[in-house]
A protein has these predicted regions:
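N-terminal Rossmann-like dinucleotide-binding module
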Residues: 1-48
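Beta-loop-alpha module in the N-terminal Rossmann-like domain of NAD(P)-dependent dehydrogenases
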Residues: 18, 48-106
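A short helix->loop->beta-strand "cap" motif at the edges of active sites that frequently abuts
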Residues: 50, 85-87, 112-115, 206
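Hydrophobic residues in well-ordered beta-strands that form the structural core
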Residues: 54, 91-92, 116-118, 142, ...
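C-terminal helix-rich "cap/oligomerization" subdomain common to oxidoreductases
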Residues: 65-68, 203, 283-320
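A contiguous active-site-proximal alpha/beta segment in oxidoreductase catalytic domains
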Residues: 96-153
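Mid-domain beta-loop-alpha active-site segment that forms a flexible
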Residues: 119-126, 149-178, 300
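Contiguous beta-strand/loop segments that form the cofactor/metal-binding neighborhood of enzyme cores
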Residues: 167-240, 271, 276-292
């Protein structure tokens, strides 16, 4: 396979990002896009000079790979049709809205020797890649992901929309099974979960606190890790990572007053600022063309979804 023919199904905000990156990748030909919104589809097609279709089945026989960025409720049916047609699939997160459908998709992909990649783009953030080199024995992990409300995502609440990014990173960072989950949630601007705090306790005694909100007036995306010998702070947006280490501390008696003095060392880690989506699509294409191994195992993909769904189940039970 000298050149890869690619298509994109669903060119909303995320889908358009895929179109833009695929159009620039070497040895990739953008063969077509699919969009049900005629006005939106024509606009993207003209901008990138690519054929447009209204039925995704029209891409069968025209593409080797496809990026699917449709609403989550449509993921299973659309992805399954492409896999059954022998086409490699990059499916935007979350994989599906239930575990059984996700398992079936991976089984079909394996049976047909096809690549099924789930779009967890934060894995390809340069700061996250450095984080996995630094963190070895986490004690406590705290994630904060806040942004203003937008009606861009109408089908999913904040758990499947954005919290799943942090769930995925946390599980792969801690590398232990979740034994207990506590969840608090609130609906603010929609009928679904707009603000969720999930506390996860792991088999190895590590604890994670994950906050996801689309009810904030500012945008914050950070992850902090406490280890015995360091405190690591990661900023997803700026792609920066800092390591704090305590160098000394002492109590001082001055004029009858007891004062505490602490000195810390702060190390800023060099992080490449490459486009995470570009790196993700390059990895996907490499898996397809060269048979390169996936960076994340199927079991890990499914476990991230399982924990996200467990959190949603707790939210539903609390509302009854």
């Amino acid at each position: 396979m000298s050149r890869v023919k690619a298509g994109v199904v669903g060119v909303g905000k995320m889908g358009e990002y895929h179109v833009g990156v695929l159009a620039e990748l070497q040895k990739v030909d953008l063969a077509g896009i699919v969009e049900s919104n005629e006005k939106r589809g024509k606009s993207i097609a003209q901008r990138y000079e690519v054929p447009i279709f209204t039925d995704y089945r029209e891409l069968f026989g025209k593409v080797d790979v496809v990026s699917i960025a449709v609403p989550t409720a449509q993921h299973y049916a659309v992805a399954m049709d492409f896999l059954n047609s022998g086409i490699h699939v990059l499916l935007e997160k979350p994989c599906t809205n239930n575990l059984k459908d996700a398992q079936e998709l991976f089984k079909v992909a394996e049976k047909k020797n096809l690549t099924l990649h789930i779009g967890h783009v934060e894995r390809f953030n340069g700061a996250v890649q450095e984080l996995f080199k630094i963190v070895t024995e986490p004690i406590f992990v705290e994630c904060t992901r806040m942004s203003p409300f937008t009606d861009r995502i109408k089908g999913d609440g904040v758990v499947l929309d954005v919290m799943i990014h942090d769930i995925d990173i946390v599980l792969n960072l801690i590398k232990s099974k979740v034994v207990k989950t506590n969840v608090l949630s609130s609906t603010v601007f929609s009928e679904r979960d707009d603000l969720v705090v999930a506390q996860l306790q792991f088999e190895n005694n590590c604890i994670a606190n994950i906050l996801a909100s689309r009810a904030s007036q500012n945008k914050v995306r950070t992850l902090e890790v406490t280890q015995k010998d360091s405190y690591v702070v990661l900023d997803y947006t700026d792609q920066e990572i800092y390591i704090h280490r305590q160098s000394s501390s002492e109590h001082q008696l001055s004029k009858g007053a007891l004062r505490y003095k602490q000195e810390s060392l702060i190390e800023r880690i060099f992080v490449h600022k490459d486009n995470p989506l570009k790196l993700e699509l390059q990895h996907f294409i490499d898996c397809v063309k060269n048979g390169s191994p996936r960076k994340v195992a199927v079991d890990s993909e499914l476990y991230s979804l399982q924990i996200a769904l467990d959190i949603l189940d707790q939210i539903k039970k609390q509302k009854k």
